Every structure is written in structure tokens, then in C-alpha cells.
Amino acid sequence: WDDAFKGFLRQEWRHIAAVTGQPFGYGLLDEPHFDYDTEPACRAVAVAQLLLAKEGEDSPSALSFFTAVQRKFYVQGSDPKAVDFYRSICAETGISFDDFRKQFESDAGKQAAQAHFDRCRAMGVRSFPTLLLERDGERFAIASGYLKAADAIDRITTTLMPSR
């Protein structure tokens, strides 16, 4: 966590904000120390998916959880490594925080996150966001990195209906 890395992040976040219109807060970049580790946030999303699946909830609830994590980190500048970071997000998405905390701090929670990482690697994902299309057991890379919706639709259409 040095000035060069903070400068890199500031530049990247400004670029992403300019391209996507997504808001960013830069307060974390003023901190004298911050361990920029994405594993806890990834683990939290994996744990939320497990808990929501137990309750029979669908994936939109998991997407809401993910979106809230992104907002709280990138806009509000809170630290996702602390389990209490997720308390309000659990409340917003109907997840018991006590259940979440137990899973988040457990080996099973860490293994769930690792399984997600392993699955991404197996599919050839090396950066985020990545958009893949799977058809008849074959995967097609539509985008690696940000892509405007219209361009994504064009690539999907081209992949599904190649010219003959």
C-alpha cells in the first residue's frame, strides 16, 4: 500500500467511473495503510449464495448481496475484510448475520470461495468482469473487461448465429 499503488487505483477507478458511470469514493486511498485483498469479499458472496440456497432463495438475492458489497467498498470506502462490514448487507438481503458470521469465519466458507476461484480458472477467466457464453458444452469468451451492452449483444449474436 504505497503512493504508486494508490495512484494506480485512483487512475483505474476514475477510468471505470468515466466509462461506466458507476460512482466511486476515494476515501480509502487516503488511508496510510490498507490491505487490498479481494478474497474476503469473494468469500462473503460465496457464503451468501450458500445461505440463500439453503433458504430456497434465487440468484437475484445473491446479486443484490454482491451489488451491496461493491457499493459499500467502492463508494463508501468501508473495509470488506472485517466481518461487521456485512451486517447491514445481511439485513438488506434477509440473511441472518449470525449464520453469515459463522460461515464467513469457517473453513467451509473459505473452501466455498476457493471453489469459486477454481471454477473461474477452469473456465479460463483471468480478469473481471468476464462474460462467457456456453452453448452445447462449448464456452465462448464474449468479453474480458468492461464492454458496452450493445457491443456485448453484437458479440453474443455473432457467436450464436455465425455467418455462413
Predicted regions, residues:
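Structural alpha/beta surface segment adjacent to cysteine/selenocysteine redox centers
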Residues: W1-K72
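C-terminal cap of thioredoxin/glutaredoxin-like
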Residues: K54, A68-R164
